[in-house]
């Protein structure tokens, strides 16, 4: 609180005591409650859903422990908590479009999302392998060094040399199904996925062949 120190008003008048400022009432905004992750609750929700709230289990598509057995559905195991939460929130607010996922998250609370993400982060990722030996060199070049002449930066700069990503910043890519990674790069390029300006910018510079090569290479990272 500011304090006004009184003095002489003028040399021509007698000194008068300074008037104290009227007390100011301040109302502090309530501090938002800190949400703590409950991985056990996330486990239950992931594997069983919550029929009373219309929440379907995740395991049916994303597999036991987040290791999807189908290339069109992403592996979620060992993914960074903050990244998973962001994607779920983006589906719910429409920033990221996917009719199936938007329906799945419609009744999830912020607590549900954090619990699911915390559970998945603790699961062991089943590693994959690169399938196309003819494109390994190109994929490795793009991932490690980028393509300078096209303005494509190295993927490793953000997603780390082994594809583990950086918690709270960039997702894990190692071991992910190549088909899924390709589909996301195409979505960024075509504008059907818009929740990363950085990735949209990079993807617009990539050809189909480059996307396939780097996606296959990332599938084998460990």
Predicted features, each with a name:
Residues 61-67, 121-122, 158-164, 219:
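Detector for the c-type heme attachment site
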């Amino acid at each position: 609180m500011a304090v006004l120190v009184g003095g002489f008003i003028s040399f021509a008048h007698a000194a008068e005591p300074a008037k104290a400022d009227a007390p100011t009432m301040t109302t502090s905004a309530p501090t938002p409650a800190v949400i703590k992750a409950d991985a056990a609750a996330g486990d239950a929700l992931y594997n069983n859903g919550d029929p009373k709230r219309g929440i379907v289990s995740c395991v049916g598509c994303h597999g036991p422990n987040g290791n999807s057995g189908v290339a069109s559905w992403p592996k979620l195991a060992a993914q960074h908590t903050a990244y998973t939460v962001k994607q779920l929130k983006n589906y719910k607010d429409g920033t990221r479009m996917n009719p199936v996922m938007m329906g799945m998250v419609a009744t999830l609370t912020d607590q549900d999302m954090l619990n699911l993400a915390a559970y998945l982060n603790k699961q062991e990722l089943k590693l994959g392998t690169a399938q196309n030996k003819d494109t390994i060199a190109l994929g490795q070049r793009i991932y490690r060094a980028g393509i300078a002449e096209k303005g494509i930066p190295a993927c490793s700069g953000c997603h780390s040399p082994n594809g583990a990503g950086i918690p709270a910043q960039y997702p894990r890519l190692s071991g992910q199904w190549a088909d899924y990674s390709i589909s996301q790069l195409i979505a960024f390029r075509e504008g059907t996925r818009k929740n990363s300006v950085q990735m949209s910018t990079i993807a617009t510079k990539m050809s189909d062949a480059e996307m396939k090569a780097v996606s296959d290479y990332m599938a084998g990272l460990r």
